Regions:
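Nucleotide-activated chemistry modules centered on ATP-dependent adenylation/adenylyltransferase
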Residues: 2-301
């Protein structure tokens, strides 16, 4: 119907106005307050799909890192949208063997349902990791070393990762197409400029690129999109007995936060007022100030 038609009846206009008011009442207040409208989420989605397709067109051998958390599940969803229902490159899970049972159950179920070409590579034991790192950072570094082994095994020239600038200060320094050295390291002081969606998608000789399609998203964006698209989630994100997980990692170095948010709607309301950092439950983020950056420089996500 043409809403601007001159021959619409007064009665018809009244019905449209009433319908509009009804739709406004159904729109969650939190979505309006944060500006998480359909248009906003569509713009985020379109930009991310563009990045996926750009990476696929310009790199020879890609993989999507799947950590099983809310961000990487959105990444799988976006990849399926970008390529018409299927992910045309492997999903790579670098497994520490210490994830929550709910995470492994989720992985097994949705690998089948989403038709993923899943590669699971185990991390080296803690004894093989730099003993000078603080305990949680040393545990997390197993993933860095496991990723290096997977790169050497498969020869990927591009790894797609679901990091966001808003979740941690070191990640705020990242680029969408981020070059890594021959050992997988990241030089935070030497990064290519990125203007107007013009990306340098040429990996250094013998090295690879990290591609970050949701770098520009926020935690609230992730949850609003998950709600809109009805993306499956791991139940640990929802509050039980006054606690929930905002960020999921290894069970031995990840703790829940105080929360009564037992639905995505309640999570969005909580995020609108909380002063608690997203990664407050990660033991790694409470160790030495430079521990996380040391890990990222060495190749951590």
């Amino acid at each position: 119907m043409d809403l601007l038609s001159n021959d619409q009846s007064t009665e018809g206009l009244q019905r449209l106005e009433q319908s509009g008011r009804a739709r406004e009442r159904k729109t969650p207040v939190i979505d309006q307050a944060r500006g998480l409208t359909m248009d906003h989420l569509d713009e985020l989605e379109a930009q991310s799909i563009y990045i996926f397709r750009e990476a696929f067109a310009r790199l020879k051998k890609l993989a999507l890192l799947w950590s099983l958390g809310k961000d990487s599940n959105v990444m799988i969803w976006l990849a399926r949208k970008a390529f018409f229902g299927r992910v045309p490159f492997p999903a790579l899970h670098v497994d520490t063997g210490k994830k929550f049972p709910e995470m492994y159950a989720f992985r097994d179920q949705y690998t089948k349902e989403w038709g993923l070409d899943l590669k699971i590579d185990l991390c080296p034991p803690i004894e093989a990791i730099d003993p000078t790192l603080p305990p949680a950072a040393r545990s997390a570094a197993r993933k860095t070393e496991g990723l290096k082994l997977a790169l050497a095994k498969y020869g990927f020239d591009g790894l797609i990762a679901g990091i966001r600038r808003d979740e941690e200060a070191t990640r705020a320094k990242e680029r969408v197409f981020s070059p890594r050295g021959t050992e997988g390291g990241w030089d935070v002081r030497d990064q290519p400029p990125e203007f107007w969606d013009q990306f340098n998608a040429s990996p250094p000789p013998g090295a690879h690129l990290r591609i970050h399609p949701i770098l520009h998203w926020t935690e609230a964006d992730i949850w609003a999109y998950t709600k809109r698209e009805n993306i499956p989630i791991i139940p640990l994100y929802l509050a039980k007995n006054g606690k929930r997980y905002r960020s999921l990692g290894d069970a031995d170095i990840t703790n829940p936060v105080a929360s009564n948010a037992s639905s995505i709607e309640e999570i969005l309301i909580e995020l609108d007022s909380t002063k608690v950092p997203e990664r407050s439950g990660r033991a790694l983020d409470h160790e030495t100030e430079d521990a996380f950056e040391r890990l990222r420089v060495a190749g951590y996500l």
